Amino acid sequence: MTGICAGIKDRGIELCDLFIAESEYDYGSGKLAKNQDGSSFLKPEPKVIPCDYTLKTKINDYLRSDVDVSMFSALKDNNLAFGKNVPSIHFAPGACGSYVIANEDFMSSLLATNRKMSGLEMEGYGLYVAGHMLNKPCLLVKGIADLGDTAKDDKFHTIGSFMSAWFVYNFLKNIY
């Protein structure tokens, strides 16, 4: 699956980087409880779904090539290059939820669940669950279009979408 997502700034993720979900979990799963003062809080119960092991090995092998440099060239060729040089590619755990986040504190709190958490989006957990249920390898690759903060806008949607589609197309071409 391709598209866009939010990156976790505290992990060094930047706009226009590329996120590949090594695993996914639903950050909204757990039990909603009440504090003594009556306020609600979530007792999280994350269920992590990993990327298919064979696919993970192929991704790691592919990332050893100069794929980041090639992707940057493709961005420049299509007049989509962002101000930074070569985008970083993060193959790391992702979090998935049912709402769009524009809150720096919430984004930082995700690191309490997994210190390597790097991406936040809305479809990956369902994709990975379906893949595991059907015994079909699947992969989530998304461009970082925002950092889940109040500066969120649509400015990087096109670049993020292009990068994720370019990566998946070239990865599949490489392994088949």
PLM features per residue range, with description:
Residues M1-Y176:
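Intrinsic-disorder/coil detector with helix-boundary
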